[in-house]
Amino acid sequence: MLLYGLDTDTSFSRALATELGVGLAPFENRHFEDGEHKLRPLSDPRGQDAYVLHSLYGGSSESPHDKLCQLLMFMATLREHGCARVSAVVPYLAYARKDRQTKPFDPVTLRYIAQLFEAVGIAQIFVLEAHNVAAFQNAFRCPTFHIEAHSAFEAMVSEGLIEQAVAVASPDPGGVKRAQLWRESLVLTLGRPVGFAMVDKRRSAGLVSSDNLVAGDVNGMTVLLLDDLIASGDTMRRAAVALRGAGARQVLAFAAHGLFVGSAAEVLCDESIGQVIITDSVSPFRLPTDHALRKRLRVVSAAPLFAQALRASHAAWRR
């Protein structure tokens, strides 16, 4: 197995390599004065099973487009030089939210991204908590592996909320299935009933309204509010306010990907949110180190989940 980590922030790739018990394969990323890049492996990839890791969020120095282009060109280079199988490991998949047309002449960008991956000859792709699982799986014609973020959160919840009445909630109708899957898993883990709720949300012309409508009983419960990502934080805050208004004892906000754009740090410091828990799929570089939210933020590693998936994939390939 060859594991390449293209991210400038190497913390996730190093954690994944440690979980797998392998070293990161060496490569060169040469920057030219005109802004172009050249990426090449520094060891012979012929006949190897290669996994290329790149989380496609916009960083402090690289846009999602920069990262996407580098990832595609490097995977194509591996195929060019005889790599037996190349797999994309993409904890955060850019443009996954644009999976359908909502206005006249809209793009379906997720499908175009999938076509780019297929054009360079990848064998399969691993993604953490896609915005819409069905749309993600249907966009790609190669095998897809969807890793559910709630598996990373489960140990924390089972240890910290042993005696408390718990409910899982979705902040909008679109995330109901995601929240239901976690609820079903928690029932087995905790060995007792777990409540369920959903907060209404409607979006029109970029404006969001919810009217604080909550479906489900959360009175006196600790609510685990689960979404795929946190961008501006408005969806989480609106839902948390509605849940507290419906009698929730406390609301803990969980998301696979913490983008924290704009004034998200201030929004999420609302008293309705007790704690914010994310995975390490995206580095929380946008949060100032001395911001109050840092004290309420917990980052859980998704590396063990990816290691399990990659290990199984490699073992099957070797057979």
State what each model feature region is.
Residues M1-R319:
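PRPP-associated nucleotide enzymes
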